[in-house]
Design a protein with these regions (language model features):
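N-terminal "arm"/small-domain region of PLP-dependent enzymes with the aminotransferase-like
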Residues: 4-69, 201
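Conserved N-terminal alpha-helix of the aminotransferase class I/II PLP-enzyme fold
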Residues: 58, 62-106
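Conserved PLP-binding catalytic core of the aspartate aminotransferase-like
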Residues: 50, 295-340, 350, 354-355, ...
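Active-site phosphate-binding strand-loop segment of PLP-dependent enzymes
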Residues: 146, 150-205
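PLP-dependent aminotransferase class I/II
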Residues: 237, 241-313
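Conserved PLP-anchoring active-site segment centered on the Schiff-base-forming lysine
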Residues: 113-132
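Conserved active-site segment immediately N-terminal to the catalytic lysine
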Residues: 200, 220-238, 257-261
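PLP-dependent enzyme catalytic core of the Aspartate aminotransferase-like
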Residues: 54, 58-62, 66, 93, ...
Length: 408
Protein backbone atom coordinates (compact mmCIF):
# COMPACT_ATOMS: atom_id res chain seq x y z
CA UNK A 1 0.00 0.00 0.00
CA UNK A 2 2.78 2.44 0.92
CA UNK A 3 4.35 1.90 -2.52
CA UNK A 4 1.19 3.25 -4.13
CA UNK A 5 1.44 6.46 -2.13
CA UNK A 6 5.15 6.74 -2.86
CA UNK A 7 4.48 6.62 -6.60
CA UNK A 8 1.66 9.13 -6.32
CA UNK A 9 3.83 11.50 -4.28
CA UNK A 10 6.63 11.19 -6.82
CA UNK A 11 4.19 12.11 -9.59
CA UNK A 12 3.23 15.25 -7.65
CA UNK A 13 6.89 16.18 -7.15
CA UNK A 14 7.58 15.78 -10.86
CA UNK A 15 4.94 18.43 -11.57
CA UNK A 16 6.03 20.72 -8.70
CA UNK A 17 2.65 20.13 -7.06
CA UNK A 18 3.72 18.42 -3.83
CA UNK A 19 3.10 20.19 -0.54
CA UNK A 20 4.54 19.89 2.93
CA UNK A 21 4.06 21.39 6.36
CA UNK A 22 6.40 24.05 7.71
CA UNK A 23 6.72 24.62 11.43
CA UNK A 24 6.31 28.15 12.78
CA UNK A 25 7.90 28.50 16.22
CA UNK A 26 6.36 31.84 17.18
CA UNK A 27 2.91 33.42 17.57
CA UNK A 28 1.07 34.51 14.44
CA UNK A 29 1.98 38.08 13.56
CA UNK A 30 3.65 40.42 11.11
CA UNK A 31 6.95 38.66 11.90
CA UNK A 32 7.26 34.91 12.44
CA UNK A 33 10.04 32.41 13.09
CA UNK A 34 10.30 29.73 10.42
CA UNK A 35 13.00 27.08 10.66
CA UNK A 36 15.28 29.36 12.63
CA UNK A 37 14.79 32.42 10.43
CA UNK A 38 12.82 35.58 11.19
CA UNK A 39 10.52 36.44 8.29
CA UNK A 40 8.05 39.22 7.57
CA UNK A 41 4.79 37.35 7.20
CA UNK A 42 2.64 38.03 4.14
CA UNK A 43 0.93 34.62 4.19
CA UNK A 44 -1.54 34.92 7.07
CA UNK A 45 -5.27 35.69 6.97
CA UNK A 46 -4.91 37.53 10.29
CA UNK A 47 -6.01 40.76 8.61
CA UNK A 48 -6.43 42.84 11.77
CA UNK A 49 -3.57 41.38 13.77
CA UNK A 50 -5.93 39.92 16.38
CA UNK A 51 -4.54 36.37 16.50
CA UNK A 52 -2.15 37.32 19.29
CA UNK A 53 -4.03 40.35 20.62
CA UNK A 54 -3.84 40.88 24.41
CA UNK A 55 -7.61 41.39 24.72
CA UNK A 56 -8.35 38.07 23.04
CA UNK A 57 -5.67 36.30 25.05
CA UNK A 58 -7.16 37.64 28.26
CA UNK A 59 -10.67 36.54 27.27
CA UNK A 60 -9.42 33.03 26.47
CA UNK A 61 -7.44 32.82 29.72
CA UNK A 62 -10.44 33.83 31.80
CA UNK A 63 -12.63 31.28 30.01
CA UNK A 64 -10.11 28.51 30.68
CA UNK A 65 -10.10 29.40 34.36
CA UNK A 66 -13.90 29.29 34.48
CA UNK A 67 -14.82 26.56 31.97
CA UNK A 68 -11.68 24.47 31.48
CA UNK A 69 -10.08 23.42 28.21
CA UNK A 70 -12.58 21.29 26.29
CA UNK A 71 -16.36 21.36 25.97
CA UNK A 72 -16.52 17.61 26.58
CA UNK A 73 -19.44 16.84 24.28
CA UNK A 74 -21.28 17.88 21.16
CA UNK A 75 -23.47 20.95 21.31
CA UNK A 76 -26.68 18.89 21.46
CA UNK A 77 -25.51 16.72 24.35
CA UNK A 78 -23.85 18.86 27.01
CA UNK A 79 -21.28 20.86 25.06
CA UNK A 80 -23.17 24.14 24.78
CA UNK A 81 -21.55 26.35 27.38
CA UNK A 82 -22.11 30.00 28.22
CA UNK A 83 -19.27 31.28 25.97
CA UNK A 84 -20.88 29.60 22.95
CA UNK A 85 -24.23 31.22 23.66
CA UNK A 86 -22.65 34.63 24.25
CA UNK A 87 -20.70 34.39 21.00
CA UNK A 88 -23.74 33.46 18.93
CA UNK A 89 -25.76 36.27 20.49
CA UNK A 90 -22.96 38.73 19.69
CA UNK A 91 -22.63 37.47 16.10
CA UNK A 92 -26.36 37.84 15.44
CA UNK A 93 -26.34 41.38 16.84
CA UNK A 94 -23.24 42.31 14.84
CA UNK A 95 -24.64 40.91 11.60
CA UNK A 96 -28.16 42.21 12.38
CA UNK A 97 -29.86 38.84 11.98
CA UNK A 98 -32.28 36.97 14.20
CA UNK A 99 -29.80 34.28 15.14
CA UNK A 100 -26.37 32.77 14.56
CA UNK A 101 -24.91 29.28 14.85
CA UNK A 102 -21.22 28.43 15.27
CA UNK A 103 -19.34 25.48 13.80
CA UNK A 104 -15.87 24.08 14.45
CA UNK A 105 -14.57 25.59 11.18
CA UNK A 106 -15.73 27.51 8.14
CA UNK A 107 -15.42 24.30 6.13
CA UNK A 108 -17.72 22.54 8.59
CA UNK A 109 -20.19 25.42 8.40
CA UNK A 110 -20.52 25.07 4.63
CA UNK A 111 -20.44 21.28 4.60
CA UNK A 112 -23.20 21.07 7.19
CA UNK A 113 -25.40 23.99 6.20
CA UNK A 114 -25.78 23.60 2.44
CA UNK A 115 -27.00 19.96 2.49
CA UNK A 116 -29.30 20.78 5.41
CA UNK A 117 -30.98 23.62 3.51
CA UNK A 118 -30.95 22.28 -0.06
CA UNK A 119 -31.97 18.88 -1.40
CA UNK A 120 -32.30 16.75 -4.50
CA UNK A 121 -35.33 18.61 -5.85
CA UNK A 122 -33.56 21.97 -5.68
CA UNK A 123 -31.05 23.83 -7.85
CA UNK A 124 -27.76 25.38 -6.74
CA UNK A 125 -26.06 27.96 -8.97
CA UNK A 126 -22.51 28.55 -7.84
CA UNK A 127 -19.62 30.81 -8.88
CA UNK A 128 -16.77 28.82 -10.41
CA UNK A 129 -14.18 30.30 -8.02
CA UNK A 130 -16.07 29.54 -4.81
CA UNK A 131 -14.12 27.94 -1.98
CA UNK A 132 -13.80 24.15 -1.88
CA UNK A 133 -16.08 23.98 1.17
CA UNK A 134 -18.94 25.57 -0.79
CA UNK A 135 -18.38 23.28 -3.77
CA UNK A 136 -18.22 20.19 -1.56
CA UNK A 137 -21.33 21.24 0.37
CA UNK A 138 -23.21 21.81 -2.88
CA UNK A 139 -22.21 18.39 -4.24
CA UNK A 140 -23.13 16.69 -0.98
CA UNK A 141 -26.61 18.24 -1.02
CA UNK A 142 -27.74 16.17 -4.00
CA UNK A 143 -29.24 19.25 -5.64
CA UNK A 144 -28.84 19.93 -9.35
CA UNK A 145 -25.64 21.94 -9.57
CA UNK A 146 -24.91 24.60 -12.17
CA UNK A 147 -21.64 26.54 -12.15
CA UNK A 148 -21.26 29.93 -13.80
CA UNK A 149 -17.96 31.54 -14.89
CA UNK A 150 -16.48 33.80 -12.25
CA UNK A 151 -18.66 36.89 -11.67
CA UNK A 152 -20.33 36.37 -15.09
CA UNK A 153 -23.78 37.88 -14.62
CA UNK A 154 -25.00 36.86 -18.07
CA UNK A 155 -24.29 33.18 -17.42
CA UNK A 156 -25.81 33.45 -13.95
CA UNK A 157 -28.99 34.83 -15.49
CA UNK A 158 -29.04 32.05 -18.08
CA UNK A 159 -28.80 29.41 -15.36
CA UNK A 160 -31.58 31.11 -13.39
CA UNK A 161 -33.81 31.15 -16.46
CA UNK A 162 -33.08 27.47 -17.09
CA UNK A 163 -33.79 26.53 -13.47
CA UNK A 164 -37.06 28.44 -13.32
CA UNK A 165 -38.25 27.00 -16.64
CA UNK A 166 -37.31 23.49 -15.55
CA UNK A 167 -39.41 23.70 -12.41
CA UNK A 168 -41.33 26.86 -11.60
CA UNK A 169 -41.70 25.73 -7.98
CA UNK A 170 -38.07 24.68 -7.44
CA UNK A 171 -35.98 26.25 -4.72
CA UNK A 172 -33.03 27.96 -6.39
CA UNK A 173 -30.01 28.96 -4.31
CA UNK A 174 -27.23 31.21 -5.60
CA UNK A 175 -23.94 30.60 -3.79
CA UNK A 176 -21.05 33.03 -4.00
CA UNK A 177 -18.31 34.61 -1.96
CA UNK A 178 -18.21 38.33 -1.29
CA UNK A 179 -14.41 38.50 -1.50
CA UNK A 180 -12.76 35.64 -3.37
CA UNK A 181 -9.93 33.97 -1.53
CA UNK A 182 -7.40 33.53 -4.33
CA UNK A 183 -8.04 36.58 -6.53
CA UNK A 184 -9.06 39.01 -3.79
CA UNK A 185 -11.77 40.55 -5.96
CA UNK A 186 -15.38 41.21 -5.00
CA UNK A 187 -18.66 39.77 -6.20
CA UNK A 188 -20.97 42.22 -8.03
CA UNK A 189 -23.43 41.94 -5.18
CA UNK A 190 -26.07 44.54 -6.22
CA UNK A 191 -26.49 42.85 -9.59
CA UNK A 192 -26.59 39.37 -8.04
CA UNK A 193 -29.25 40.48 -5.56
CA UNK A 194 -31.34 41.93 -8.39
CA UNK A 195 -31.18 38.65 -10.31
CA UNK A 196 -32.01 36.75 -7.14
CA UNK A 197 -35.14 38.85 -6.65
CA UNK A 198 -36.13 38.73 -10.32
CA UNK A 199 -36.14 34.92 -10.29
CA UNK A 200 -37.35 34.29 -6.75
CA UNK A 201 -34.08 32.66 -5.73
CA UNK A 202 -32.23 32.61 -2.41
CA UNK A 203 -28.72 33.91 -1.80
CA UNK A 204 -26.04 32.14 0.25
CA UNK A 205 -23.12 34.54 0.76
CA UNK A 206 -19.75 33.53 2.17
CA UNK A 207 -18.18 36.63 3.75
CA UNK A 208 -15.06 34.84 5.06
CA UNK A 209 -12.53 37.29 3.61
CA UNK A 210 -14.74 40.39 3.95
CA UNK A 211 -15.77 40.33 7.61
CA UNK A 212 -13.52 42.50 9.71
CA UNK A 213 -12.18 44.14 6.55
CA UNK A 214 -15.11 45.63 4.62
CA UNK A 215 -18.31 47.37 5.68
CA UNK A 216 -19.40 49.26 8.77
CA UNK A 217 -17.65 47.77 11.82
CA UNK A 218 -16.28 45.07 9.52
CA UNK A 219 -19.70 43.54 8.94
CA UNK A 220 -18.87 42.58 5.35
CA UNK A 221 -19.64 43.46 1.76
CA UNK A 222 -23.40 43.01 2.10
CA UNK A 223 -23.43 45.81 4.67
CA UNK A 224 -21.19 48.05 2.59
CA UNK A 225 -23.67 47.68 -0.26
CA UNK A 226 -26.69 48.09 2.08
CA UNK A 227 -27.94 44.68 0.99
CA UNK A 228 -27.59 42.59 4.13
CA UNK A 229 -31.35 42.13 4.46
CA UNK A 230 -31.45 40.62 0.97
CA UNK A 231 -28.97 37.87 1.86
CA UNK A 232 -30.78 34.75 3.05
CA UNK A 233 -27.75 32.98 4.53
CA UNK A 234 -24.65 34.81 5.74
CA UNK A 235 -21.66 32.55 6.27
CA UNK A 236 -18.39 33.64 7.79
CA UNK A 237 -15.32 32.56 9.66
CA UNK A 238 -13.81 33.33 13.04
CA UNK A 239 -10.33 32.34 11.88
CA UNK A 240 -9.31 35.21 9.59
CA UNK A 241 -9.86 38.85 10.55
CA UNK A 242 -11.30 37.80 13.92
CA UNK A 243 -8.09 35.99 14.73
CA UNK A 244 -9.48 32.83 16.36
CA UNK A 245 -10.92 29.62 14.85
CA UNK A 246 -14.31 28.39 13.70
CA UNK A 247 -17.14 29.25 11.34
CA UNK A 248 -20.64 30.62 11.67
CA UNK A 249 -23.97 30.95 9.91
CA UNK A 250 -26.25 33.96 10.43
CA UNK A 251 -29.88 34.21 9.36
CA UNK A 252 -33.40 33.66 10.58
CA UNK A 253 -34.09 31.93 13.88
CA UNK A 254 -36.10 29.22 12.14
CA UNK A 255 -33.19 28.49 9.81
CA UNK A 256 -30.64 28.18 12.62
CA UNK A 257 -33.03 25.96 14.59
CA UNK A 258 -33.33 23.76 11.52
CA UNK A 259 -29.54 23.57 11.25
CA UNK A 260 -29.32 22.49 14.89
CA UNK A 261 -31.54 19.57 13.93
CA UNK A 262 -30.14 18.74 10.49
CA UNK A 263 -26.58 20.03 9.94
CA UNK A 264 -24.51 16.88 10.37
CA UNK A 265 -21.18 18.68 10.85
CA UNK A 266 -22.78 20.52 13.77
CA UNK A 267 -24.64 17.59 15.29
CA UNK A 268 -21.79 15.08 15.18
CA UNK A 269 -18.87 17.30 16.24
CA UNK A 270 -17.62 18.08 19.72
CA UNK A 271 -18.30 21.71 20.57
CA UNK A 272 -15.41 24.14 20.05
CA UNK A 273 -13.36 24.86 23.19
CA UNK A 274 -15.09 27.52 25.32
CA UNK A 275 -11.90 29.58 25.40
CA UNK A 276 -12.04 29.98 21.62
CA UNK A 277 -15.66 31.08 21.81
CA UNK A 278 -14.77 33.64 24.47
CA UNK A 279 -11.87 34.97 22.41
CA UNK A 280 -14.07 35.23 19.31
CA UNK A 281 -16.69 37.14 21.33
CA UNK A 282 -13.93 39.55 22.39
CA UNK A 283 -12.98 39.98 18.72
CA UNK A 284 -16.56 40.87 17.77
CA UNK A 285 -16.72 43.36 20.64
CA UNK A 286 -13.45 44.89 19.43
CA UNK A 287 -14.78 45.30 15.89
CA UNK A 288 -17.71 47.28 17.27
CA UNK A 289 -15.39 49.64 19.16
CA UNK A 290 -13.56 52.78 18.08
CA UNK A 291 -10.35 50.78 18.35
CA UNK A 292 -11.72 48.26 15.88
CA UNK A 293 -12.53 50.95 13.32
CA UNK A 294 -9.06 52.44 13.72
CA UNK A 295 -7.53 48.99 13.19
CA UNK A 296 -9.52 48.52 9.98
CA UNK A 297 -8.46 51.93 8.72
CA UNK A 298 -4.85 51.00 9.44
CA UNK A 299 -5.29 47.86 7.34
CA UNK A 300 -6.64 49.90 4.43
CA UNK A 301 -3.78 52.36 4.82
CA UNK A 302 -1.41 49.42 4.43
CA UNK A 303 -3.32 48.20 1.37
CA UNK A 304 -2.96 51.70 -0.09
CA UNK A 305 0.79 51.72 0.51
CA UNK A 306 1.38 48.47 -1.37
CA UNK A 307 -1.07 49.51 -4.08
CA UNK A 308 0.86 52.72 -4.68
CA UNK A 309 4.23 50.97 -4.66
CA UNK A 310 3.13 48.34 -7.21
CA UNK A 311 0.63 50.46 -9.21
CA UNK A 312 -2.26 48.08 -8.52
CA UNK A 313 -5.83 48.47 -7.29
CA UNK A 314 -6.66 45.69 -4.82
CA UNK A 315 -10.27 45.29 -3.71
CA UNK A 316 -9.36 43.59 -0.44
CA UNK A 317 -6.42 42.56 1.73
CA UNK A 318 -5.54 39.79 -0.76
CA UNK A 319 -3.11 40.61 -3.57
CA UNK A 320 -2.47 37.84 -6.14
CA UNK A 321 0.66 37.96 -8.31
CA UNK A 322 0.14 35.61 -11.25
CA UNK A 323 3.19 33.79 -12.60
CA UNK A 324 1.61 30.73 -14.23
CA UNK A 325 4.32 28.09 -14.13
CA UNK A 326 4.47 26.07 -10.91
CA UNK A 327 8.27 25.79 -10.77
CA UNK A 328 8.76 29.49 -11.40
CA UNK A 329 6.20 30.32 -8.73
CA UNK A 330 8.01 28.14 -6.20
CA UNK A 331 11.29 29.78 -7.18
CA UNK A 332 9.80 33.24 -6.72
CA UNK A 333 8.46 32.33 -3.28
CA UNK A 334 11.88 30.97 -2.30
CA UNK A 335 13.54 34.12 -3.63
CA UNK A 336 11.34 36.26 -1.40
CA UNK A 337 11.95 33.96 1.57
CA UNK A 338 15.70 34.28 1.06
CA UNK A 339 15.17 38.03 1.26
CA UNK A 340 13.18 37.83 4.49
CA UNK A 341 9.53 37.48 3.37
CA UNK A 342 7.12 34.60 3.90
CA UNK A 343 4.80 34.45 0.89
CA UNK A 344 2.93 31.31 -0.23
CA UNK A 345 3.21 29.80 -3.70
CA UNK A 346 -0.37 28.90 -4.65
CA UNK A 347 -0.63 26.10 -7.21
CA UNK A 348 -3.08 23.63 -8.71
CA UNK A 349 -5.51 22.36 -7.49
CA UNK A 350 -6.02 25.41 -5.26
CA UNK A 351 -6.03 27.48 -8.46
CA UNK A 352 -6.46 26.44 -12.08
CA UNK A 353 -3.62 24.86 -14.02
CA UNK A 354 -1.40 27.56 -15.47
CA UNK A 355 -2.56 30.11 -12.89
CA UNK A 356 0.06 29.51 -10.19
CA UNK A 357 0.72 32.63 -8.18
CA UNK A 358 2.18 34.34 -5.21
CA UNK A 359 -0.59 35.36 -2.82
CA UNK A 360 0.18 38.31 -0.59
CA UNK A 361 -2.13 38.92 2.36
CA UNK A 362 -1.87 42.18 4.23
CA UNK A 363 -2.48 42.94 7.89
CA UNK A 364 -3.01 45.95 10.07
CA UNK A 365 0.01 44.66 11.99
CA UNK A 366 2.38 45.40 9.11
CA UNK A 367 4.54 48.52 9.22
CA UNK A 368 4.85 50.85 6.23
CA UNK A 369 8.56 50.07 5.96
CA UNK A 370 7.79 46.34 5.70
CA UNK A 371 5.36 46.95 2.85
CA UNK A 372 7.79 49.12 0.94
CA UNK A 373 10.54 46.56 1.45
CA UNK A 374 8.24 43.86 0.07
CA UNK A 375 7.43 45.95 -3.00
CA UNK A 376 11.13 46.50 -3.63
CA UNK A 377 11.79 42.76 -3.32
CA UNK A 378 9.01 41.98 -5.79
CA UNK A 379 10.51 44.42 -8.28
CA UNK A 380 13.88 42.67 -7.92
CA UNK A 381 12.46 39.25 -8.82
CA UNK A 382 13.91 37.70 -11.99
CA UNK A 383 12.16 39.13 -15.01
CA UNK A 384 10.27 35.93 -15.81
CA UNK A 385 8.71 36.06 -12.32
CA UNK A 386 7.61 39.68 -12.51
CA UNK A 387 4.29 38.95 -14.11
CA UNK A 388 1.65 41.61 -13.65
CA UNK A 389 -0.81 40.92 -10.83
CA UNK A 390 -4.52 40.56 -11.33
CA UNK A 391 -5.92 44.09 -11.40
CA UNK A 392 -9.35 43.78 -9.82
CA UNK A 393 -10.99 47.18 -9.47
CA UNK A 394 -13.01 47.93 -6.40
CA UNK A 395 -16.76 48.08 -6.80
CA UNK A 396 -18.18 51.37 -8.02
CA UNK A 397 -19.06 52.24 -4.46
CA UNK A 398 -15.46 51.59 -3.42
CA UNK A 399 -14.78 51.43 0.29
CA UNK A 400 -17.02 52.66 3.07
CA UNK A 401 -16.97 56.45 3.26
CA UNK A 402 -14.87 56.34 6.43
CA UNK A 403 -12.19 54.42 4.56
CA UNK A 404 -11.61 56.68 1.57
CA UNK A 405 -8.01 57.73 1.07
CA UNK A 406 -8.75 61.20 2.46
CA UNK A 407 -9.59 59.57 5.78
CA UNK A 408 -6.12 58.09 6.21
Amino acid sequence: MSDIYARQLEALRARSLDRHLREISSPSGAIVDLEGKRLINFSSNDYLGLANDPQLREAATKAIAEFGIGAGASRLISGTQSPHVRLETALAKWKETEAALCFSSGYAAALGTIPALVGKNDVIILDKLCHASLIDGAKLSGATLRIFPHNHLGKLKSHLEWARQKNSAARIVIITESVFSMDGDRAPLPEIVKLKMDFGAQLFLDEAHAVGVIGRNGRGLAFEENLSQEVDVQMGTLSKALGVSGGYICGSRNMTEWLINRARSFIFSTAPPPALAAAAKAAVDFLLSIGGEKRRQRLWRNIDILAEELSIQPASAIVPWIIGDEKETLAAAQNLQDNGFLVPAIRYPTVAKGAARLRFTLSAAHEATQLRSLAAAIKRLPKRDRTKPIRRLRSARGRPVAEQRTGH
